[in-house]
Amino acid sequence: MTTVGLIGSGRIGGTVARLAVAAGHQVLLTNSRGPDTLKDLAAEIGPLARATTGREAAEGGDLVVVTIPLRAFPSVPARPLAGKVVIDTCNYHPQRDGQIPELDSGALTSSELIQRHLPESAVVKAFNNIYYRHLASLARPSGAADRSYLPIAGDDAAAKVAV
């Protein structure tokens, strides 16, 4: 059974957690306010979900989803994510995140910024172009004829296969 660590358990993270548990995976939920604030969500999702800290989710996740406002990416613990596949859902919103010169100039993409912060991880961009409610309502089991597909992007072929 795969364990999915979620660094961020808001709309996208909570939806990904529900879908992962429905597919039989364990999930580790985190947010910036601490595990106590996620106990109700973990209970709602079921026994395969557990509220924890960001570091514990990074250490315990076989696959880790970073789904936080982009301005918070420096808080993502790099060392425990070394050698792991990290799914980046972050989008840059200057009005929320503040100005990030490398992104404003086009010198870097948001995923390149995160990859620079996580140099020993394989970062794959996914889930950043779909409304969280559609992510849930369009979910189908593997092999379903009406299954939706989401684009992903990354430099590591094996990591993209894992996602």
Where are these regions (language model features)?
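NAD(P)+-binding Rossmann beta1-loop-alpha1 motif at the extreme N-terminus of oxidoreductases
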Residues: 1-44
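Nucleotide donor/acceptor-binding cores
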Residues: 2, 84, 148
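Short, well-ordered alpha-helical microsegments
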Residues: 38, 73-74, 160
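Internal alpha-helical scaffold of NAD(P)-dependent oxidoreductase catalytic cores
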Residues: 41-44, 52, 116-123, 131, ...
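Rossmann-like NAD(P)-binding element
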Residues: 46-48, 52-98
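Rossmann-fold NAD(P)-binding glycine/threonine-rich loop
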Residues: 90-141
